[in-house]
Amino acid sequence: MKYTTLGQTGLNVSRIAFGTWQLGGDWGRFDEDAAIAAIRRARELGVNFFDTAQAYGFGASEQILGEALRDELTTERDELVIATKGGLRQTDSGLVRDASPEWLRRGVDASLTALGVDHIDLYQVHWPDPTVSAAETAGALRELVSDGKIGHVGVSNYNAWQMAEFSATLPVETLQPPYHLFRREIEDGELPYCRAHNIGVLVYGPLAHGLLTGTLSTHTAFAADDWRSTSGVFSGSAFDLNLATVRALAMFAADLEVTISQLAIAWTLANPAVHVAIVGARHVSHVQDSLAAADVSLSDADLDTIDTIMSFGAQVAGPSPEGM
């Protein structure tokens, strides 16, 4: 495993972080024991950076992560970097954004309990909340840093001007945006902003929500409780087009003697503004395949070939809270 310093945080983190969105109930049923084994295997293979969120099952994902790392959180706490996110609230009508000071404080306390830790290394605002001023949100997190409950503050799904507004009260230390071969809009604004301000970037969705694993087809049937079952990007003509693009990528990956998953993850890490790629897994075998991507180097010619292949694909966006 390779490591890097996460922007201005000073945290030494593995270039691939273990993500836990898939353990929160939005991706269908899963075997919890297998998921715990996957987390533990990731740690054995050198991963020291783990990302979760209060909204991933509202405590469920955090509890699984805490259980999987229970011994390590006792014996090697200083070697682990635990990141979580807050600022979403579940209502009868679905998820809503709530980055109010009161909800963030409650969220931090709930996450500490669910994870079984006394502090959170990196706490991120999950989505910008247009109903609460950036100064209020940032001010509340600054107090939580002073209280010792969180170590560093980041944001997720923010654009450049939202980060600038937030930083007027408290410097944004990290950004967690969506980024993969089928979704590259942050290359124009957010990534240059982060490079200019030494903001650590940990990207989520490098496998395009499963599309870049090469395991999906027109015959794939998503479970009813998997958000992709109602997503237009995983059906219809755009999906067919992207499956053809994935097949072409898989052929190129084979030429490089890597899997398509490894190629996709390595591509995100090849961007000089990206520090870390967050990759989720439910099984040990998925972990071992994904982590090997940290050692894959892509030449400029390789990147050009990938760009040519991707020019035939359609954009793949993920869900927002309002769509979950």
Where are the model-predicted features located?
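Terminal-tail/helix-coil boundary detector
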Residues: 1, 224-251, 255, 270-275, ...
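Aromatic-lined glycan-binding groove of carbohydrate-active enzymes
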Residues: 186-225
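N-terminal binding-site loop/beta-alpha segment at the start of enzyme catalytic domains
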Residues: 1-80
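N-terminal small/glycine-rich loop or linker at the start of catalytic domains
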Residues: 8-26, 83-96, 119, 124
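Short helix-capping segments at alpha-helix termini
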Residues: 71-79, 115-116, 144-149, 167-171, ...
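Glycine/proline-rich, positively charged
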Residues: 40, 44, 91-185, 189, ...
